[in-house]
Amino acid sequence: MQTLTHGGDWAGYRAEFGRDPLDFSANVSPLGLPGGVAKAITASLATADRYPDPLCRALREKLAAAEGVPAEWLLCGNGAADLIFRLALAEKPRTALVTAPTFAEYATALGTVDCRVERHFLREENDFAVTDAILDAVHPGIDLVFLCQPNNPTGQLARPALVEALLRRCEAVGAVLAVDECFLDFLPEGQSLSAKRLLSTSRKLIILKAFTK
């Protein structure tokens, strides 16, 4: 059985040590639950006896309006990790590329479909930034590339021009580029840095976002 690797397992900590932890294992908002979310949860309690819409139609329409993209481009899941595993299962890549260091869930998900994971190592002399060197790592044998934007755990952000160049390189070799933007909205200029401007130009681009951030 696969062991839990994602952070936030406060229940397991409590069971083992008998007290609640100060949990820094998952990068969630320190500001707590937004008031609007609490009100929406309270308002929906009357219909809690029903199964939710499996296609998340209303949610997708709201997200589409907020993000400025068609609703049919959106797929909702139980967190970004759920969608990372779904992507690996849907694509079943033979070989994938990730940076190192980066979010460990990519390699874990790829391992469930026996995918060979190649790592593009980020260098200390470059302050662990993603540079143009990553383009050479995307060879014709690569089926899927994960790019964390900004990267977890380094916090480094790849230049938008480099992200576009990486997408074009992926297209050239037939690979899918998955850009994880779960932390991008923490940046004041996050929306302007998003790769979503490229969605209308390519069928090889997937963008991940998450509510927990």
Locate the predicted segments by residue:
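N-terminal "arm"/small-domain region of PLP-dependent enzymes with the aminotransferase-like
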Residues: 1-50, 141
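Conserved beta-strand elements of the Class I
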Residues: 22, 75, 95-97
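Short glycine-rich anion-binding loops that position phosphate/pyrophosphate groups of nucleotides
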Residues: 27-30, 80-81, 103, 149-153, ...
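Short loop-beta-helix segment that forms the pyridoxal 5′-phosphate
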Residues: 52, 64-86
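Short hydrophobic alpha-helical segments of the AMP-binding
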Residues: 63, 110, 170
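Glycine/small-residue-rich loop that forms an oxyanion/phosphate-binding "nest" at active or ligand-binding sites
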Residues: 79-89, 93, 179-183, 187-188
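PLP-dependent aminotransferase-like
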Residues: 89-147
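Active-site pre-lysine segment of PLP-dependent enzymes
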Residues: 128-141, 153-177, 181-212
